[in-house]
Amino acid sequence: MISQFFILSSKGDPLIYKDFRGDSGGRDVAELFYRKLTGLPGGESPVVMYHGDRHFIHIRHSGLYLVATTLENVSPFSLLELLSRLATLLGDYCGSLNEGTISRNVALVYELLDEVLDYGYVQTTSTEMLRNFIQTEAVVSKPFSLFDLSSVGLFGAETQQNKVAPSSAASRPVLSSRSDQSQKNEVFLDVVERLSVLIASNGSLLKVDVQGEIRLKSFLPSGSEICIGLTEEFCVGKSELRGYGPGIRVDEVSFHSSVNLDEFESHRILRLQPPQGELTVMRYQLSDDLPSPLPFRLFPSVQWDQGSGRLQVYLKLRCDLPPKSQALNIHLHLPLPRGVISLSQELSSPDQKAELGEGALHWDLPRVQGGSQLSGLFQMDVPGLQGLPNHGPSPLGLGPASLSFELPRHTCSGLQVRFLRLSFSACGNANPHKWVRHLSHSNAYVIRI
């Protein structure tokens, strides 16, 4: 049972507010939540907070805060599951979940909340069941995008135009417009991995963790069967080996309740009949042992002239992906000592960009090809550096560096989708369209200096 539900933007602006029980302090509660959240030290943001007589439970999605409040002693895990399901529902019915789609579909969001929750009690979170009650049509605004006009793929990879879906293809609502009777039968399957790495200052690997998901978004009629074939060498646990190669191993795996696993042990095939909308077919985790080298290595060199207070940092970034692969949207964040007053730079390519901001060096590289390396020489004047104490992991107060990036068509675990088959009889005469994408991105890629 919840008292309130509200959605805030990344800046704390209220986008949606719903009071179910009338036992709250009004809209001021949303402002109180954001003030408490942003006042925490070190950017901490616990998903469960308690203030006064009220519990706040929240999740973040695409820069938005989805928050539920309750005065009762309710299991936080059940409310977190409800918020996650609400995020999926809003994405299904609005096409995608972000500040723009919420602002354009306020009436639709309130209608969904009225059907999902009655006096704070959950009635249903089924996308399929709600289709019978939701009358408001989603307002979809398709922005102009060069991705739809060029030969650039979904994640920036160059490919043939007729082999990729438009960039906004998966961002349409599952409830088709009454004026649009030609909605395509399509299914989108994404294999997404989040990579967490900690590298010591001497280059040794201290920690590595991969969190992966197979996500499905279906626009097929209900009852359509989907068959997903995974890599045959895929194995779970260290004791299981398949095939003649080293195998593609994960430590843990879990499946959606609708997945039929009868053929998983023998052929690594998943079968399911999903409702329209988005669901997570499978989650998996791999720690401490990657089948391939890390995507990036950083080689720093630091020189400090104590007399002049000049600090020189040379960074060489090497991409250890295969030559045919590439990384996109690379951003390096390097905390600097206090008192930096100037920055001069020499970059190895003209498309790079570096600047100072919020006490750190920000180095942006739009694209890096596998097997290549890029470098940057940064010189800074830090007069106050002479008085810093000489202790800690970095005596100069430099680092650690953190990297963020995307790896299209690449999975760090090696897991691939062999095939995606659909039940044609259930889809009618129209030939369904299938799209499979693989993507890895950084979660916390930290390198000590």
Curated annotation (Swiss-Prot):
Listed GO CC annotations: AP-4 adaptor complex; clathrin adaptor complex; cytosol; early endosome; trans-Golgi network
BP-aspect Gene Ontology terms: autophagosome assembly; Golgi to endosome transport; Golgi to lysosome transport; intracellular protein transport; protein localization; protein localization to basolateral plasma membrane; protein targeting; protein targeting to lysosome
Pfam entry (one): Adap_comp_sub
Segments forming domain MHD: 184-448
InterPro entries xrefs: Adaptor_comp_med_subunit, AP2_Mu_C_sf, Clathrin_mu, Clathrin_mu_CS, Longin-like_dom_sf, MHD
Membrane topology field: Peripheral membrane protein
CDD domains, sorted: AP-4_Mu4_Cterm, AP4_Mu_N
UniProt GO molecular function: protein domain specific binding
Keyword tags: Endosome, Golgi apparatus, Membrane, Protein transport, Transport
Subcellular location: Golgi apparatus, trans-Golgi network membrane; Early endosome
Entry's family note: Belongs to the adaptor complexes medium subunit family.
Subunit structure comment from the entry: Adaptor protein complex 4 (AP-4) is a heterotetramer composed of two large adaptins (epsilon-type subunit AP4E1 and beta-type subunit AP4B1), a medium adaptin (mu-type subunit AP4M1) and a small adaptin (sigma-type AP4S1). Interacts with tyrosine-based sorting signals on the cytoplasmic tail of cargo proteins such as APP, ATG9A, LAMP2 and NAGPA. Interacts with the C-terminal domain of GRID2. Interacts with GRIA1 and GRIA2; the interaction is indirect via CACNG3.
Its biological purpose: Component of the adaptor protein complex 4 (AP-4). Adaptor protein complexes are vesicle coat components involved both in vesicle formation and cargo selection. They control the vesicular transport of proteins in different trafficking pathways. AP-4 forms a non clathrin-associated coat on vesicles departing the trans-Golgi network (TGN) and may be involved in the targeting of proteins from the trans-Golgi network (TGN) to the endosomal-lysosomal system.
Name by which UniProt lists this protein: AP-4 complex subunit mu-1
